[in-house]
């Protein structure tokens, strides 16, 4: 958090850890992508293209994708950016537990407080179709973030989640209420 807001220097500060052709560690690289998103939190216009490229170029590494998803989520927070949403949806649809969990959370961050129907129509059915509990947890948090501050508009979704057979949705219910 010490570098949050250093938009101009962010990439150079993290350069030794960012993904390159001579890979160091996928954990360092994924963490650096997430850190880059934090530096550009809610001011991500200048870095989202880089993060989207990293997300697509490193599709073979769930760890790097995890960091890129979270970085995109934080950098594009509450932007409703459809390009980011679509890329995150592709990661979610790959049905890989680690990257999918981050994609679910990141979709919620990008669509924070929008109540976006398209996001909800992706997340809720997907949670029923996947066998990965990690993905379901990420989706539950994502749903809560999408419905952030929607108050009465969230009531029907809250009722739906209360009746749902997916127990983790009770967490989403609780988070939406808070």
Q: Where is each model-derived feature located?
A:
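Alpha-solenoid helical-repeat scaffolds
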Residues: 1-178
